[in-house]
Amino acid sequence: AYLECWHLDVEEFLDLGKNTGDDRRRTHDMNTANWIPDLFMKRLEKGEKWTLFSPSDVPELHDIYGKEFETKYTEYEKKAETGEIKHFKTVEAKDLWRKILSMLFETGHPWVTFKDPCNIRSPQGHVGTVHSSNLCTEITLNTNEDEIAVCNLGSINLPQHIDEGKINVEQLKSSVTTAIRMLDNVIDINYYPVPQAENSNKKHRPIGLGLMGFQDALYKLGISYDSEEAVEFADKSMELISYFAIEASCALAEERGTYETYKGS
């Protein structure tokens, strides 16, 4: 569950994973995360206050981000000051941030995730707002009442592509190209427990390709994990995977056509 940090219930939300207190108000087995706008971090940096609202009083905030969010949020704060909005609470941004970090250290939850960067960098911004991520926070896709975001994931076994002290680029290209085609095929043959998931997956066709065995690859290369060389190798290896993945995706688009919501992305 993700909750924006302007929500009036955010302080209780932070306590959901605590090991003390009324167990009826705890969710020990649920993963939780904070969805934080840049404006909160700006207020925190300046030592300013932060206002919590009931979502029924500020319906637009959920679906906007960036400058538009900042403008609307400050408008709602002015309405709260003049009494037009009755249900709100003003807190010190640093106090809320301190509680966020305290709960994170104590329970591992809620995670800290950032709303504005996820939306600003989303290639699918033309079809809606990203409201959350997944369990491991590695995908950021649009969700709404008709669509439940689904992303088919795979990994390249990096140490299997180390040959004679370097990355075997041609072998890596072959593996990535095969993996991209495989993941795209999964979209069509997958089992979907609910129609909203199938609708989303086939409409946007999102896939994710990463790597595994990074430390093993470093070992084969004789590179220390805690070194500048390791950082450079991480950049180089992922740059290659990204390039070949995009190249393979373009080839698939030529062969099968673009996905339904490609235009405008």
Where are these regions (language model features)?
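Electropositive phosphate-/nucleotide-binding environments in soluble metabolic enzymes
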Residues: N34, T90, K94, K173, ...
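Active-site cavity-forming subdomains of large catalytic enzyme subunits
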Residues: A1-V169, Y192-N199, A245-G264
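Contiguous, well-ordered alpha-helical segments that form the cores/surfaces of helical PPI scaffolds
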Residues: E12, S155, D184, R205-K220
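Internal maturation/activation junctions in enzymes
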Residues: S175-E198, K202, P206, S224-S265
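Short glycine/threonine-rich loop-to-helix capping motif typified by GTGT followed
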Residues: D15, H126-V127, P206-G213, I241-F244
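Structural helix-adjacent loops and short alpha-helical linkers that scaffold large soluble proteins
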Residues: E164-K173, G222-D226
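Short coil-to-beta-strand
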Residues: I148-G154, T178-R181, M212
